[in-house]
Amino acid sequence: MATDFRFAGESAVFGQPEVLLGILPGAGGTQRLTRLIGITKAKEINYSGRQVKADEALQIGLVSAVFADDDCYPQALEAAKSYARGPKSLQFIKRVMMDGLALPLDEALKLEAEAFGDCFETEDRLIGVQSFLDHGPGKATFTRK
């Protein structure tokens, strides 16, 4: 649960069975699940210890996508490669989203505005804009600088 995206094979099963052992989900299990899927569903899963199949996990936001079992790893790897080729602004986006969650909205918006300005100081902004003008969206090869 401590990743940006979670992919599952269609036969995957998830759960927080610790309550059935008389303990609670440790290592962040209560907090991460709640932040991912909301408190009502997280309570249901944590209180019951029941298993969640892949299709339900997708429906409640526990996973980002479900693929055929044999196709899951290649799909996840391709997604990771795609993000790794992305612009420096991806770093700003992740930081602002994660840090902003802990801030009041007005402060989070200031953080976003600062990061927006920082994007204009990157090589990737120049590359992205020129590529858009020359070739349309989604064609740039970024340097992550």
Report each predicted region and the residues it spans.
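CoA-thioester-processing core
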Residues: 1-47, 59-60, 75-79
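C-terminal long alpha-helix characteristic of the crotonase
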Residues: 7-12, 54, 63-110, 114-117, ...
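Hydrophobic alpha-helical segments typical of transmembrane helices
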Residues: 29-32, 41, 92, 112-115, ...
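Terminal peptide-recognition signature
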Residues: 33, 57, 93, 132
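Short acidic-aromatic low-complexity motifs
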Residues: 48-50, 126-127
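Acidic, divalent-metal-coordinating active-site segment for phosphoryl/phosphodiester hydrolysis
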Residues: 50-56
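Generic structural signal for alpha-helix termini and adjacent loop/cap motifs
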Residues: 122-123, 135
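Short, basic/aromatic-enriched C-terminal tail that caps enzymatic domains
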Residues: 128-145
